[in-house]
């Protein structure tokens, strides 16, 4: 008996939709990262993108536990001297809630070339509507 290894041409990518309303950010991000990697499938192969597409709606209604809204700080740097910028989770949630979820999921993906392909399969929307109804996404229970 031989071990079956997934190939890029034979992988079937499904679409899932997740409602992020009143869901804790870290718990959502871990499960979404596993679906993006394909670890929920029996044909999971670390070197092949076996993951599925994930659409997250209601990103502005995500929950953070404890004092993370005020205490959690996100940093970015322009590359120039003195070019560091910081924003709290509360400020990021009010301005760009999609980016808050995207950064959380990105931190839980592997740090390699394949992670960029996996992150492209993540679609995050702040409202309840999304333009991916044609793909007939299935509801992903958390």
From Swiss-Prot:
Q: Which InterPro entries does the UniProt record give?
A: Ribosomal_uL13, Ribosomal_uL13_bac-type, Ribosomal_uL13_sf
Q: Which family does it belong to?
A: Belongs to the universal ribosomal protein uL13 family.
Give start-end of the signal peptide: none
Which keywords has UniProt assigned to this entry?
A: Ribonucleoprotein, Ribosomal protein
Q: What does this protein do?
A: This protein is one of the early assembly proteins of the 50S ribosomal subunit, although it is not seen to bind rRNA by itself. It is important during the early stages of 50S assembly.
Organism name: Trichlorobacter lovleyi (strain ATCC BAA-1151 / DSM 17278 / SZ)
NCBIfam families attached here? rplM_bact (TIGR01066)
What are the protein's GO molecular function terms?
Answer: mRNA binding; structural constituent of ribosome
Name of the protein = Large ribosomal subunit protein uL13
Return the GO cellular component terms, semicolon-separated: cytosolic large ribosomal subunit
Q: How does it assemble?
A: Part of the 50S ribosomal subunit.
